[in-house]
């Protein structure tokens, strides 16, 4: 055990020996730090307010100067200074069992959770403080916090021990506050437009609704394999078949894929479905929703993301995949008249890497887009009219069966949303699922399975419907100016930590 931990453990024992708890049962908080700082900002330097408060938080700083001491504590809302006068603290020791000024000075460390009772005072230097009358130890910290000046410089440790990151990095705490507010805003925005929130299964007998490799688990009692959902799409569409015309789900999605600054195997999305709508309606909804979220969170429709200015107020570009590929690469896919080999050679000439999976004109077009165009789309851009081969759940285009009524929204070179005019023809859907199943049988683990129950639902009849999915984590990255998706997920998945450190055991039943 480290010397610091042993010393702090001894202080906890000392508290118990004096008849005080080192880990309290509860504490009644009357006000948050932010409320006090706002409510009593009017006080003049040196002025006191006859207002009793009880506040709790973690000790972040400690300064003892003879018979007075200053502490800084932090709660969820902010920080406030505590002012301790030895005479006041020790005034009622004979009447009540309280911690003395000497106890506080000797036993309390940075990192401890404490609760105080007192009144409000603004110091002569102008800092609003709590003039402490009584002090309670709420939880004794046994390990020191990271140095407050250098913070938590090990980025991986910030993700692995998020609790430390939140303590020493106010920006991280603000990121997760913003995340919570954005999610709440989106829910209210949809609720106010009469969308109904639905909860669909996380454990599914078939993983469908996206091209992705699922996580597999097993149900012991039923003795069947189950999959963690890779999308909420197919179950939400079943709800539309059942008569719910406007539905959505905000929830966790699981995809057994790689980890990067843009990808986490467990992430949050919102999927939205509206009967009697198409992908043009979904474009309008997407633009309106995201503009409203950005304005509410940032106070402006012009934001800075990683030194790039993003203007959400201007009309968002809508352009087909073929046209934007031609714009950025000079390759006109219409000019090949279906000659796949000629198109493939043109693509190789601009150094696009091709796998064996890229075996159709549509997949070739998509590969060029992903490798040569996507990263260049900084301002909000709707890329529309995708190849049918990569869009098995989308409605065919009006006059071209090789493409579908689909769009993806790109901002700062990243996909943020994906939407279709939904395919509601059960015969067409079965044919596409059969093709997907054949690809899966050939080894493509991301291809769709045939979902007979979903096909049965379509045969019952589904109205024309527009569907949309928005990646919440990537949206929060934009709003909070975060470079990595790991910065906006409280506990991202990380590689196993390689360590030889043995677990330290504390003495049992000594500290209460």
Curated annotation (Swiss-Prot):
Keyword Signal carried by entry: no
Oligomeric and partner information: Homodimer.
EC number(s) reported in the record: 6.1.1.6
Gene3D superfamilies from the UniProt entry: Bira Bifunctional Protein, Domain 2, Nucleic acid-binding proteins
EC top class, as a word: ligase
Record-linked HAMAP family: Lys_tRNA_synth_class2
Pfam families, per the entry: tRNA-synt_2, tRNA_anti-codon
Family from the record: Belongs to the class-II aminoacyl-tRNA synthetase family.
PANTHER family reported for this sequence: LYSINE--TRNA LIGASE, CHLOROPLASTIC_MITOCHONDRIAL, LYSYL-TRNA SYNTHETASE
Organism: Prochlorococcus marinus (strain MIT 9215)
Catalysed reaction equations from the record: tRNA(Lys) + L-lysine + ATP = L-lysyl-tRNA(Lys) + AMP + diphosphate
Main location as per UniProt: cytoplasm
Cofactor note: Binds 3 Mg(2+) ions per subunit.
Binding site for Mg(2+) 1: 408, 415
Cross-referenced InterPro entries: Aa-tRNA-synt_II, aa-tRNA-synth_II, aa-tRNA-synth_II/BPL/LPL, Lys-tRNA-ligase_II, Lys-tRNA-ligase_II_bac/euk, Lys-tRNA-ligase_II_N, Lys-tRNA-synth_II_C, NA-bd_OB-fold
Keyword entries, A-Z: Aminoacyl-tRNA synthetase, ATP-binding, Cytoplasm, Ligase, Magnesium, Metal-binding, Nucleotide-binding, Protein biosynthesis
Gene: lysS
Protein's UniProt name: Lysine--tRNA ligase
Binding positions (Mg(2+) 2): 415
GO cellular component, one term: cytosol
GO terms (BP aspect): lysyl-tRNA aminoacylation
Keyword Cell inner membrane recorded: no
Compartment(s): Cytoplasm
GO molecular function, one term: tRNA binding
Cofactor(s) needed for function: Mg(2+)
């Amino acid at each position: 055990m480290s010397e610091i931990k042993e010393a702090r453990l001894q202080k906890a024992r000392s508290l118990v020996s004096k008849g005080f708890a080192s880990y309290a049962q509860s504490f009644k908080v009357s006000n948050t730090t932010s409320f006090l700082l706002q409510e009593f900002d009017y006080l003049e330097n040196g002025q006191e307010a006859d207002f009793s408060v009880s506040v709790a938080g973690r000790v972040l700083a400690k300064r003892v100067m003879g018979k007075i001491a200053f502490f800084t504590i932090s709660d969820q809302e902010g920080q406030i200074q505590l002012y301790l006068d030895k005479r006041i603290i020790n005034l009622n020791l004979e009447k009540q069992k309280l911690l003395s000024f000497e106890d506080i000075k000797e036993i309390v460390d940075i990192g401890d959770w404490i609760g105080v009772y007192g009144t409000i005072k603004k110091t002569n230097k102008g800092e609003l403080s709590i003039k402490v009358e009584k002090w309670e130890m709420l939880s004794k910290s046994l390990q020191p916090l990271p140095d407050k000046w250098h913070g938590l410089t090990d980025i991986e440790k910030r993700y692995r021990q998020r609790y430390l990151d939140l303590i020493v990095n106010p920006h991280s705490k603000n990121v997760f506050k913003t995340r919570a507010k954005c999610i709440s805003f989106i829910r209210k925005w949809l609720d106010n437009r009469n969308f109904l929130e639905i909860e669909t299964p996380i454990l599914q007998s078939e993983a469908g609704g996206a091209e992705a490799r699922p996580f597999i688990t097993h149900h012991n009692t039923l003795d069947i394999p189950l999959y963690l959902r890779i999308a909420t799409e197919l179950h939400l569409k079943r709800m539309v078949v059942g008569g719910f015309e406007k539905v959505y789900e905000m929830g966790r999605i699981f995809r057994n894929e790689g980890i990067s600054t843009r990808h986490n195997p467990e992430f949050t999305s919102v999927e939205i479905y509206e009967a009697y709508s198409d992908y043009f309606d979904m474009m309008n909804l997407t633009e309106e929703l995201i503009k409203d979220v950005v304005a509410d969170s940032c106070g402006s429709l012009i934001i800075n993301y990683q030194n790039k200015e993003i203007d959400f107020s201007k009309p968002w570009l809508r352009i087909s995949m073929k046209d934007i590929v031609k714009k950025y690469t000079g390759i006109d896919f219409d000019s090949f008249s279906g000659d796949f080999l000629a198109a493939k050679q043109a693509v190789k000439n601009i150094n696009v890497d091709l796998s064996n999976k890229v075996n159709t004109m549509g997949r070739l077009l998509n590969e060029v887009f992903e490798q040569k165009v996507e990263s260049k789309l900084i301002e909000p851009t709707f890329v529309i009219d995708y190849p049918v081969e990569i869009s098995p759940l989308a409605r065919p285009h009006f006059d071209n069966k090789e493409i579908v009524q689909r769009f993806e929204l790109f901002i700062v070179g990243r996909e943020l949303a994906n939407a279709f005019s939904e395919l509601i023809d059960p015969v067409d859907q079965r044919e596409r699922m059969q093709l997907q199943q054949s690809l899966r049988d050939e080894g493509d683990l991301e291809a769709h399975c045939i979902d007979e129950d979903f096909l049965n639902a379509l045969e019952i009849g589904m109205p024309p419907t527009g569907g949309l999915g928005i990646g919440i984590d990537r949206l929060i990255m934009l709003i909070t100016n975060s470079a990595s998706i790991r910065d906006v997920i409280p506990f991202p998945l990380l590689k196993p930590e390689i360590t030889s450190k043995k677990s330290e055991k504390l003495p049992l039943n000594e500290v209460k």
